[in-house]
């Protein structure tokens, strides 16, 4: 039997690609990507190119978005979505995943640039929420997850030259 967590992550990758593809009728405001990275670890460290700019160009024109999915944790539940205080092997399994997108944020942004960055992040947050919702619905309809739920989406940064949006989803396997 395959790990159902891998299936949930695969469904999430597919939905993120669908919502962030650059060649759709209404592409992402900040530019899209077909690349969704599956990452590991406690936190996501965007690759250096996300926050890199040419010395003569502070516009971030040459750095694209970095989109990812990460398994945050595995846990046990007696009544989803509440985590069991003592997780015996007989309890239902559950996972929490995170989807996120990181983009370049210039140090010397003008007020107009800051407004544009805010609108891009608003668009990113909507797309991640929709992608996670669609992936969780697919997981339930395919019988991979008994129950699902979305966590809150939250901004990160700007830190250095990076700004990001992160959101979690939970699935009872």
Where are these regions (language model features)?
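Short, solvent-exposed segments of well-ordered alpha helices
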Residues: 86, 90-93, 115, 119
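Small/polar-rich, solvent-exposed N-terminal microdomains that initiate assembly or binding
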Residues: 1-85
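General secretory precursor processing signal
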Residues: 63-66, 92, 136
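The N-terminal extracellular segments of secreted preproproteins, especially immediately downstream
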Residues: 59-62, 88, 103, 132
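Short acidic, glycine/proline-rich loop/turn micro-motifs
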Residues: 109-114
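Short, solvent-exposed beta-strand/turn "edge" segments of beta-rich domains on protein surfaces
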Residues: 82-91, 156-160
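Acidic-leaning, charged glycine-interspersed low-complexity segments
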Residues: 23-40, 117-172
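Oligomerization/assembly interface segments of phage tail-like spikes and tubes
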Residues: 91-107, 159-173
């Amino acid at each position: 039997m395959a790990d159902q967590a891998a299936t949930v992550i695969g469904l999430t990758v597919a939905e993120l690609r669908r919502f962030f593809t650059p060649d759709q009728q209404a592409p992402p405001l900040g530019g899209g990507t077909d690349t969704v990275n599956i990452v590991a670890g406690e936190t996501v460290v965007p690759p250096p190119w996300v926050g890199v700019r040419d010395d003569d160009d502070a516009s971030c024109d040459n750095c694209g978005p970095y989109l990812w999915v990460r398994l945050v944790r595995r846990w046990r539940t007696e009544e989803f979505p509440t985590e069991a205080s003592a997780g015996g092997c007989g309890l239902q399994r559950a996972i929490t995943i995170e989807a996120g997108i990181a983009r370049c944020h210039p140090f010397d942004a003008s007020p107009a640039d800051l407004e544009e960055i805010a609108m891009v992040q608003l668009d990113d947050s909507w797309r991640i929420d929709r992608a996670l919702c669609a992936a969780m619905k697919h997981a339930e309809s395919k019988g991979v997850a008994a129950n699902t739920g979305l966590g809150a989406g939250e901004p990160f940064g700007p830190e250095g030259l990076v700004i990001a949006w992160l959101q979690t989803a939970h699935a009872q396997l």
